[in-house]
Amino acid sequence: MNTKQYNTKTYVLTALFAALIFLVTAYVLHIPTPATGGYIHLGDAVLYLAASILPTPLAVAAGGIGEAMSDAMTGSVVYAIPTFLIKSAMVLCFASAGKKIITKRNIAAAIFAGVICVGGYYLTESILYHSFVSPLVEIPANLIQAGSSAVIYILAGNALDRANLKNRISLTEMRG
């Protein structure tokens, strides 16, 4: 029976993606939204890349940890656990199998992940604010974040596909 085992390079790449997701979310183009204390960022674009490159369980770990750490480190601690859950669910939309990052399925996944993001934070804020009305003010900012992250993901993914990235790295080894 063949079992899939991740090599050291896969774990290192997972840690690098977690760190990159954290940095891009917390510090690169970090735009606060005063209405709710949240912020707009492009970390989801890196999350989508991780989800398209890494094996799913490791992409879930990298995305959830990186995004939750950014909330914890930038003063949005109350969102850290919901962020871990929401971002982990977003990763599950993507497929890392195949030789390309940008596929029709992954483009659709970016859109669906955006819906999960907007809906997840609406539900989170509804619980935190004890209201289904007040979180409506955050939806436009979440839509901007989801849309801009999808565009950046597609542009970066196409560039990495042209560089033949997925064929240059081997993230698993087969053991019998």
Regions found by a protein language model. Give the residues of each.
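Loop-helix junctions at membrane interfaces
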Residues: 1-176
